[in-house]
Amino acid sequence: MRSSKNVIKEFMRFKVRMEGTVNGHEFEIEGEGEGRPYEGHNTVKLKVTKGGPLPFAWDILSPQFQYGSKVYVKHPADIPDYKKLSFPEGFKWERVMNFEDGGVVTVTQDSSLQDGCFIYKVKFIGVNFPSDGPVMQKKTMGWEASTERLYPRDGVLKGEIHKALKLKDGGHYLVEFKSIYMAKKPVQLPGYYYVDSKLDITSHNEDYTIVEQYERTEGRHHLFL
């Protein structure tokens, strides 16, 4: 980790811009955040700059800003921190999210470093969400805490996770995430390990065109190893 600390400091800021569509509705979001990459937490303030108020649940977007901000994951010393080690060149990731009612999201993200600030460029496409489902009816109430399993494959790092959105009328709405993380230079890959995450919306206006989020994340080995 010593080499990454030459580039990534104890406290870092980031800027994020998302362009996307959900069931054909176009939108753009911009935000600024900050946090402590080696302690595993960060916050971000976001604003819908085009297409608001959004006609779908904000929750399907929220993981792409912070669950997508992988440089803020705390790692133990014996697990190589693939994303931090990729800087200053940075890395990219791709993600597919399959929702239990047939909705599908594909996301691409580019993470770079400019003048000591992380820059995230995100493209988001959501399709096939039923008009009477939780997403289009805005019936979700945030994500449960979750654990991603990560493993090296074909020179990149892959991640898989089963996440659950809480519903206003009780119960859960299930989503399968599959992600691929790709450094822009040769980087030491970790073995098989886990990352625990908890993402919360800490404030928002009535129509969710201004939102603040907070996330805690930490990598670990399996508890029985």
Swiss-Prot record:
Key words, A-Z: Chromophore, Luminescence, Photoprotein
Annotated positions of the (Z)-2,3-didehydrotyrosine modification: 67
InterPro entries, sorted: GFP, GFP-related, Green_fluorescent_prot
Keyword Translocase listed: no
Record carries keyword Acyltransferase: no
Taxonomic superkingdom: Eukaryota
Function in brief: Thought to play a role in photoprotection of the coral's resident symbiont microalgae's photosystems from photoinhibition caused by high light levels found near the surface of coral reefs. In deeper water, the fluorescence may be to convert blue light into longer wavelengths more suitable for use in photosynthesis by the microalgal symbionts.
Protein name: Red fluorescent protein drFP583
